[in-house]
Amino acid sequence: LEALAGLCGVESVMTRESQDINYPESASTTAQRKQSDQKARIELINAQEDAVLISIHQNFFPTAQPSGCQVLYGKPEGSRELGELTHKNLTEALCPQSRRVAAPISEDIYLMRAAKCTSILVECGFLSNRNEAVLLQTEDYQLKISALLLASYLQYEAGSDGMVL
């Protein structure tokens, strides 16, 4: 997504580029490490002028049946509009059979609660679903998701309801 955004002239700031995280020495427990990581990420997000947060995740469920994308949105202005637009684009292109809808995110999710900017959390699919897990690991599918996320962002910024791609 970062590379595609750059090709379109959209500046992006990554809050994390790998699973490797540098923790302060004082963070000795898992909870302290997670808090430290979350705090550093939210400071970076909230320091950006006119930011839009797109938090990308893969879902997991105890059973293999659930599938499809889902977009959750925060409270700041524009979050619902971006969330609904992104969800519409993802489901129409990748999982048209999905009955999921974009929804407000739980207040329990610190990153989304503390973000002061337009913010969405995108669940790209279920790693617990064997077919989706295979798809989610392919470059082609990752590129499709990235293109749809960027198109949704560009549509949102342009104030358009039509598909950009």
Question: Model-found features: residue ranges?
Answer:
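Active-site-proximal helix/loop segments of hydrolytic enzymes
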Residues: 1-165
